Amino acid sequence: MQLLKKRILQDGKCYEGGILKVDGFINHQMDPVLMKSIGVEFVRRFAATNVNKIMTIEASGIAPAIMTGYLMDLPVVFAKKKSPKTIQNALSTTVHSFTKDRDYEVVISADFLTPNDNVLFVDDFLAYGNAALGILDLIEQSGAKLVGMGFIIEKAFQNGRKILEEKGVRVESLAIIEDLSNCCIKIKDQ
């Protein structure tokens, strides 16, 4: 995805500790044209699967998941980071946020994640794989099946992909960051 890579290099900001800030176009202010391109690419990569539901975790995964769901004409469900009083048949798990350095209990209603679902998980970042592992747990609890995981940006210098692939997960990342040393963004050629 050349458009995405160009945007990361142009507008992404690097901070110590392996943090890449893309809040000007992905996860605070969003670029709808870029989001559409991201959705189109996820559709291209997962069109041959039997996916019938798109899943994400709030909040930064919602925009790319909605775009992908819209383009595939599929429902989108997201795991919530706070359990509303109105949720019924809740499935829950604990997820550690790398960026915020805290744990969240994430929940989803079993009414919206069932054994009949073939799930594509879409999110903004893959770092250590914490959110993805939490989603795997929710999918297992529900009896649904995972067809794959799509990430806008992957940090290859962290071990999220390795952990997921060891569990048999298909991982597709649209931009892979090889290194952020000295606040220089190095993107892998794909």
Curated annotation (Swiss-Prot):
Its main location: cytoplasm. CDD domains: PRTases_typeI (cd06223). Keywords: Cytoplasm, Glycosyltransferase, Purine salvage, Transferase. GO terms for molecular function: xanthine phosphoribosyltransferase activity. It is an enzyme of class 2 (transferase). 5-phospho-alpha-D-ribose 1-diphosphate binds at residues 127-131. One of its GO terms (biological process) is XMP salvage. Coiled coil: none annotated. Homodimer. Converts the preformed base xanthine, a product of nucleic acid breakdown, to xanthosine 5'-monophosphate (XMP), so it can be reused for RNA or DNA synthesis. This is Xanthine phosphoribosyltransferase.
